[in-house]
Amino acid sequence: DRLSYNEYLSFETVGCTKQDILQLMTTIDRRFMAGLAYFLGARELGMGVARVGNGIPELQWDTISRIHSTCGMVVPSFIMKLIEFAEKNGIDYTNSSLKKCICIGEALRTPDFHLNTLGKKIQEKWSSLKLFSTYASTEMQSSFTECEYFCGGHLQPELIIVEFLDDDNNPAKEGEAGEVTITTLGVEGMPLLRFKTGDICYHFDEPCKCGRNTTRLSSVLGRKGQMIKYKGTT
């Protein structure tokens, strides 16, 4: 119930309604908990769901053509694969039924809310497609999702408590970098108390133009103690 409610709120945040048809371009198998959450949340909202799975651009476009999917749940770099396939095969993708994508797994924006290089490439090709960025982790069992104003992912305060801590474990000020630290609410199997995610972000507390008053999160600036692996050596 908690997982489905989390994604129900996320779909509402991006403006989905029961008139939308979600195309899941990600697996719900192989222990990918979020995939099941997307499906359950969409059904709770009343959306139709096409469970296509990841990869296979030809199958994705066939499904969009047949079912008229309006929203995609997708890794943003795969959108470029969809565009490349469409261009090679004469598909008029800019006039397809797909109007928005909720992007997972990869950064889409810079910390100041502008599209990053990948986001710009997608928008240059497909300007009518709305791209919504998200931030989530398995540990928090919740997500931060952008609204239509694209100025940070909104906290879902009934599901987690979030803090942003500096190197001395003091609260980071609004607009300053801080480590995302979360306390889960309503989790029974493995509840977490002030769990440090290792992700460094900015946060913003002023009310959003969408009318929500919840804390908003920037894209991830980096990882605390980030390491680069080179030829098997840390």
For the regions a protein language model found, what residue spans apply to each?
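AMP-binding/adenylate-forming
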Residues: 2-12, 21-81
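Beta-strand-connecting loops/turns
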Residues: 19-20, 175
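Active-site glycine/GP-rich loop and adjacent strand/helix microenvironment
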Residues: 45, 52-234
